[in-house]
Amino acid sequence: MKAVVCHNGELAVEEIPIPEPGKGNVLLKVRRAGICGSDLHARVHCDETAAIAEEVGYSHFMRSGESVVLGHEFVGEVVSYGPGCRKRWKPGTRLCALPIIRHDDEVEMVGLSEKSPGAYAEFVEVSEVLAIPVPDGVSDEDAAMVEPLSVAHHAVRRSGVGKRDVAVVIGCGPIGLSVIMLLKAAGVKTVVASDYSEGRRELARRCGADAVVDPAVESPYNAVKAQRKYFTRAGDLFDEAFKALNLLQVVPGVPWRHIVRFADDNGLTPTGPVVFECVGLPGVIDSIVSQAPLRSRVVVVGVCMEPDTIRPALAINKEVDLKFVFGYNPDEFAETLHFIDKGKIDPSLMVTGTVGLSGASAAFEVLGKAEKHAKVLIDPSSLVSALT
């Protein structure tokens, strides 16, 4: 079969053997695959990522000297089954699958491991138990977007954001746009998006952002202030506390301590917005901690591949919650597909181009400095070799 192989940072279309599905696995004919930011990172930073993965107990992440078929966002149709499968779906049935697979009792990441070729190819092997049938009303293009949207779904759920909270999305690349869509699907009424790129800001509007800001012109937190009263100075917060306690103690005997505790436990005391960091560059987290209102919640979704620095004392003095998120759960993956099927999210809003296998390398170059493009898909049956 034809596949896009990554070796020492170079991408080339090569002929490689069609995978033979192992125990419990299914062979799919790839219909669409998405180019992920993780693939862009893996192409140039895979050795650093592999070292980090080893620290958390995973030793199969790709290395630069290996020949790896990338692609962990995909949809395909059933071709054949390996031994031990339940064979739940007929040949030709379209499936999405979590990109995790077992080979010889070793768990590997599909498309990010030499032993588990990904979906930048005509065929891909997946785990039967992690596969989900695609409803008839969901297009191939939308189905290929389930995986990155699941990352956003997980980030939104882990953030604890409520419908009445104001959410701020810093960075409107594919993950930032996905977070915007999942925030709106979760019922969050006010979503502020921030990006230097005019093209990305327009995509953010299309994906549902209620306010869009160019940070070179205006701070996104100024837009936040227009939505709700937040505190940016500690003195103002202390003053508010004095006023509240004076009011609570006007009537002698009022159990003010219990009232304050109840208010705090139920989110009724002053807080900041929920900020999603979707850039992944050095200095961004510290910038958010510095500029965001007091008691903000910061959710780090963007992957910074370089050592970074924050000022813990500043974060402590502002009582900022800092949370890092990774991946998603199987139920979130399935629910994301359900959201697409029911029209709660529209992945097509962020898909800006499709190429064939021969166009993958050129697409990587464009996406590395994208202004116009956000999400690009690969169609193995297409002859398109360049983005327009």
Where are these regions (language model features)?
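C-terminal hydrophobic helical "lid"/dimerization subdomain
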Residues: 237, 248-252, 261-264, 282, ...
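ADP-ribose/adenylate-binding Rossmann-like module
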Residues: 277, 290-307, 322-323
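Glycine-rich beta-strand-centered segment in the early N-terminal region that forms part
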Residues: 19-33, 48-101, 135-137
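Glycine-rich Rossmann-fold phosphate-binding loop(s) that bind the pyrophosphate
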Residues: 171-174, 303
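NAD(P)H dinucleotide-binding glycine-rich loop of Rossmann-like/cofactor-binding domains
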Residues: 60-67, 72, 95-170, 218
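Rossmann-fold dehydrogenase core element
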Residues: 297-299, 310-349
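Adenosine-nucleotide cofactor-binding segment
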Residues: 169, 184-282
